[in-house]
């Protein structure tokens, strides 16, 4: 079952999620929208195993990285992005 990985613009560019991922799903890409000048990206979301370690590692109040397991979607959870 595939999982969906979403990175929101609340990302502060700290790299915690990238370092926490055991499957190398996330990477940092250049972005001018935060002080760090980079944002997490999920180019290999198909490799996500759904462990949610990236969510646990995220230091922002609203998790900048979210993993939606299988049939979960932002709509079914009442979230927007």
Swiss-Prot record:
Q: How is the cofactor bound?
A: Binds 2 [4Fe-4S] clusters. Cluster 2 is most probably the spectroscopically characterized electron acceptor FA and cluster 1 is most probably FB.
The protein's name in its UniProt record: Photosystem I iron-sulfur center
Q: How does it assemble?
A: The eukaryotic PSI reaction center is composed of at least 11 subunits.
Q: Per its UniProt record, what Gene3D superfamilies does this chain match?
A: 3.30.70.20
What Gene Ontology terms describe what this protein does at the molecular function level? Answer: 4 iron, 4 sulfur cluster binding; electron transfer activity; metal ion binding; oxidoreductase activity
Query: What keywords are assigned to this protein?
Result: 4Fe-4S, Chloroplast, Electron transport, Iron, Iron-sulfur, Membrane, Metal-binding, Oxidoreductase, Photosynthesis, Photosystem I, Plastid, Repeat, Thylakoid, Transport
Q: Quick check: keyword Cell division in the entry?
A: no
Q: What does the UniProt record say this protein does?
A: Apoprotein for the two 4Fe-4S centers FA and FB of photosystem I (PSI); essential for photochemical activity. FB is the terminal electron acceptor of PSI, donating electrons to ferredoxin. The C-terminus interacts with PsaA/B/D and helps assemble the protein into the PSI complex. Required for binding of PsaD and PsaE to PSI. PSI is a plastocyanin/cytochrome c6-ferredoxin oxidoreductase, converting photonic excitation into a charge separation, which transfers an electron from the donor P700 chlorophyll pair to the spectroscopically characterized acceptors A0, A1, FX, FA and FB in turn.
């Amino acid at each position: 079952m595939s999982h969906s990985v979403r990175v929101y613009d609340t990302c502060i560019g700290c790299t915690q999620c990238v370092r926490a991922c055991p499957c190398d799903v996330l990477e940092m890409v250049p972005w001018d929208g935060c002080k760090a000048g980079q944002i997490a990206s999920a180019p290999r979301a198909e490799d996500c195993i759904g462990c949610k370690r990236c969510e646990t590692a995220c230091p922002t109040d609203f998790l900048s990285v979210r993993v939606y397991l299988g049939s979960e979607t932002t709509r079914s959870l009442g979230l927007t992005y």
